[in-house]
Amino acid sequence: MNILSLFVLIPLLMLLGLWIARNVNQVRGVMVAGSTLLLALAAYLTVSYIGQRHAGATAEMLFTDSIVWYAPLHICYSVGVDGISVVMLLLSSIIVFTGTFASWKLKPLTKEYFLWFTLLSTGVFGFFISTDLFTMFMFYEVALIPMYLLIGVWGSGRKEYAAMKLTLMLMGGSAFLLIGILGIYYGAGAETMNILEIVKHQIPTEMQRIFFPMVFLGFGVLGALFPFHTWSPDGHASAPTAVSMLHAGVLMKLGGYGCFRIAMYLMPTGAAIWGDFFLVLTTISVVYGGFSAVVQTDLKYINAYSSVSHCGLVLFALLMMTRVSATGAILQMLSHGLMTALFFALIGMIYGRTHTRDIRQLSGLMKIMPFLAVGYVIAGLANLGLPGLSGFVAEMTVFVGSFQNPDLFHRTCTIIATMSIVITAVYILRVVGKILYGTCQNPEHLKLTDATWDERFAVICLIIAVAGLGLAPYWVSNVISGSVEPIISQLIR
């Protein structure tokens, strides 16, 4: 069996194990065993991929395999990875692993919750290993469908409204995406849906002009592209902790990954035609998301709008179409995925104790729960780009690469986008100063306890990942840059 298929097989076996589990301890055992296997598999795959590249492997995708699924439409189960998908698999496995511990005490319906959570994970892993357009779309839908129940049943606040809004908007984006994929298939005339074969065929310019915006918009909705981002803050705010972690940390990255891997790679002329239009929208996303975070008072909404800004920066960097900016975009996906997972984990732990996310009702938490408070400070410092943490490496690579474009329009957009650095500092320092320091105003909060062992373990794992990427970014950027080059070389400026 191909090693990549294990990323689908293991979650499927986890689903079976969860189905037959008879109590909460067995459910936890299945989740810990399965998520640990996935993390170990992702680490092994990363090391193997680097080893094969160093040994001289030149193929664009490694560990490839293809099985005919439906011959009349040339649909195959085709898998393969390059440096981009390898780091996305590693990110996904880290968040699934830590999300398991962040949900350790979740009630009620623990078994059913983890069933849907694992199905969501299956879709995410399957999407990143797929090289067939239809298979990729299928896994994309598998990843979206569980979100409705995970938010609608186990969420909080206006959970039914948030779940329905998220589902309708993302399914609307999927409709555009499906039309775009069919346009690529018929336009290429390749009699295959394999990305590696389609890219060898030239799709007519007029078809690219029509179908590029459909594919980019279809994925862009999931990437919180302005003005189609409104589902994201409500969805984040209402979702349970681990779902918020996976949603913001990984699911939104499917949007940026799809825009780069499918829309821009397969339709480079369309990217040249529409690039400046979408660049304006992404610039607005970056700045608007930051300003929106400044005026929020709910911790989850603050982080949700921060995610809109940071995910907008991913699409912004991709549309700059330079090798350095594209490398920065992938680093930003990885960095933001880890940072926002850490944020949502900590927010969930604080909310579980205080039963409020309103920063006006929180203060003095540094003395009451120092571990969680220090974790929040580290997450905040990473988010505002402190050197030595992941945010600095990613954002500087994005802005340096973006400024390499010599024309006035692109440099103006870059200068506007850099405002997000200052805006981020404003809302992060505001929240840290408000909730962690000062005198505790609520006597009931003085009785609260700090993080438990399972919570500490999840937080420490994420902090290590954030610090590791910030202190030793070379190995990640080296893996990414080699895979960015073939896609960038396709693009027309």
Residues of each region from the PLM?
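Hydrophobic transmembrane alpha-helices and their helix-loop junctions in integral membrane proteins
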Residues: 98-104, 122-134, 147-434
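Alpha-helical transmembrane segments and their helix-start/interface "positive-inside/aromatic belt" motifs
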Residues: 25-36, 161-171, 369-374, 453-461
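Cytoplasmic juxtamembrane regions at transmembrane-helix boundaries
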Residues: 101-116, 241, 249, 444-454
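Transmembrane helix-loop-helix hairpins at membrane boundaries of multipass inner-membrane proteins
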Residues: 2-3, 18-101, 105-115, 191-197, ...
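Central hydrophobic cores of alpha-helical transmembrane segments in multi-pass inner-membrane proteins
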Residues: 5-20, 32-45, 89-103, 120-122, ...
